[in-house]
Amino acid sequence: MKIITLLWTLMLFGVAHAAGKSVASMIKLDGQFKMVPGRLRDAVAFGYFDEAINKTGWNYLSIRSNDEYSNADQSYAAGFLEGALTAKQIYIQIKIHYPDPAPPQKVQHFFDANAKWEEEEKKSGKNLDYWEQRTNLDIQVEGIYDGYMAIAKGAMRNVTKYQVIVATYEYDVWDLSIVLPDEGNVCYNEPRFRNRCHGGERVDHCSALIKILPNNEDVLFSHVTWAGAQTMYRIYKAYDLRLHLRDGSLIPGHKVAMSSYPGRFTSGDDFYITSARLAIQETTIAIWDESLNKNIKPQSVLQWARSALAYRLATSAQEWVEWYSLYNSGLYNNQWMVFDYNKFTPFEPLRDGAFFIFEQIPGGGHGGDMTAWLREKTYWASYNIPYFKDIYNKCGYPAKVIEWEAKAMSWEMAARAQIFRRDHRKVTDLASMARLMRYNDFQHDPISSCNCTPPYTSQYSISSRSDLHKKDGVYPFPALAFRDHMGTDVKIASMKMLDDHLGAAIICGPTYDQQPVFEWKTSQLGPLAHEDYPARYDFPFYIARMDVDGEMDFDYTPFYHLK
């Protein structure tokens, strides 16, 4: 490692700054941690933050730890650096998304019982590597809080620990606030969760596509997040945490790149690529049959931790499913897709075991090797509806087909299923994949039609733009209507990019290929807080690569911009 020398260095809170970029190291002297500016040779960890959101649509964070230190020291230092380097972003997120100083009491009771159960499991002598790595996650979370508080001044300090760290496990809180027996029937008050209360509208939370290119040249792995406009405060992150298993070897997923948000070291979209050459993503599925929720118990591992443990410990797609399905909490239920690039050779057929999916529900799940399907069809599409019949039926989708319509609830006939089935053949390279994942011509595509006034909806396409719907439109159910809901990004992985410093093609912002560019000042959504957000989301795709020239920074080059 060499020390980074900056032309202009500002000694402020132990961070070196230059042109929007910050570099800091965590050292340990006489048993005490200290953050210092720049990159130091023998540091426990160092971090790099590029505040480029108004230039590219993303901020960029990378953190690398030193394997000469213990797992606990590396985890704490990594968390501390993240909390310190992104303290401003964490605070802005708190103001917009996390006004509540604590979770609902019923959720806190669940967390307390869960923590007690986990401590007993750690003493059982089973799955020792799993539980040691589970402990490391909690240490990293503590580091985020301490790093934030080390930087916070003035109003930034008027927050609770919960508000600083809740981003990490927000989806667990999200579901628990709804499914646990009511204590006063108070719904979770955080803005991004309010429409998930009983009786609220369903929120589709992603489109995904895996596509084999012609002649088996490569396999593209892509994901679109669907969410509200205020979630477009993004950080693309890369970690190289040199944590060890009990046999002394490095964890397989010690390097991971992901799309993410301030204050968390999981993705949340979810989209990951790892040093084990795995690509991982999901789309959320709904639990319409609430009787399943009786299976949600604190004697489990929360979803945020299971996803992090799986991407760190897995060496194959099958192993990822095995790790993730352990101690199922039944929270934040998704169809997960994992592609193993170790089982792919360009211009040759996929080898068995290359592609697995896993669908989780409270009390169970169903996974399987879908390589044969992918080999035959050349694509796999995911759109918030379970594939496996047992999961589909248990979740209550057949009744929803009758209540709503097949175009919304049927795995075979969903609008996005139809569009992917029609258009996947157009994907022949990275640029054409980018175009498909940004596609939404809802005013003209017959698949986007509905029994509505006007007679179409952007929900029936690949990248939603519900912010463009008519406010006075008439729709058969709320999910199709005007609301703060849109495709907020695209991420695309490939073997070629993965093997080039865990690279990925990324874009932040709603589609503007067939629709107008999203601008806060002209949006129908009205006056939503957006401090430090880009004013206009007309960014191109960028190729983001980590660890270029050993510096653990980001290289981002635009490659596709619709003219």
Q: Positions of the model-derived regions?
A:
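N-terminal mature-domain region immediately after signal-peptide cleavage
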Residues: 15-319, 323-563
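Cleavable N-terminal signal peptides of Sec/SRP-targeted secreted and luminal proteins
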Residues: 2-18
